[in-house]
Amino acid sequence: CDEENASILSDTIMRAERDGSVSHGLFRLPAYVSGLVSKKINGKARPELQNVAPSIIKVLGNNAVAPMVLSLGLPAVIDLAKKNGVAVLAITNSHHMAALWPETEAIAEAGLVGIACTSYKPAVAPAGATKALYGTNPISFAWPRPGKTPVVYDMATASMAMGEVQIAKREGHKVPLGTGLTKDGKETTDPGEIVDGGVILPFGGYKGSSIAMMV
């Protein structure tokens, strides 16, 4: 992993840990290291920016970690939005999106409204089902407030982020009923039964399920 990639990734981990998002802080470090060792993550990647349309840009991640990709794409999409009034940034071939709020917050701090979302590998069963179809598919929103900090939220469309379930398993905590199902499709408060072959449920039943589908 070269210095630029390492610096950007470590800053992302530090900010998540600082802001209390334990599931996206130091907890993620072993997975990042494993990805670098296995070559799933290109630690020397240089993402490429492409202009798709007047208000649409795309960044080819080249298997970089997402914060590295966003370091190129975020300033570009902010400039484009200020020029055209609206802009869209699409990201492909990046590894693990990390938390979304640092990016939407940066957009709001630039005086713009930001919305971000990402899909992920299946871990969440649709409402009424017992098999995974959706990822935890988070969505984040930020709104600027002149002279004040922006209004920002970042949430999984699952009942709980996968990282939070994994941390609960590691620390021996129970999770609320309704968080997920066992591999046999039964409700459980044991995070281990969810992580090891089970599924997470969407938040709010069919409402969260529909938002996950949209993402």
What label would you give each PLM region?
Residues 5-9, 25-28, 32, 69-77, ...:
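General structural feature for long, well-ordered alpha-helical segments within catalytic domains
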Residues 1-9, 15, 22-40, 167-169, ...:
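Acidic, glycine/proline-rich low-complexity segments that act as flexible tails and inter-domain linkers
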Residues 24-78:
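Active-site cofactor/substrate anionic-group-binding motifs, chiefly glycine-
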Residues 54-56, 86, 198-200:
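Short, solvent-exposed beta-strand edge segments and adjacent coil->beta transition regions
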Residues 123-193:
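Phosphate/diphosphate-binding glycine-rich loops and adjacent basic-rich segments that engage nucleotide
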Residues 57-146:
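A generic, well-ordered mixed alpha/beta core segment in the N-terminal half of proteins
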Residues 197-215:
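Internal helical hairpin/lid segments
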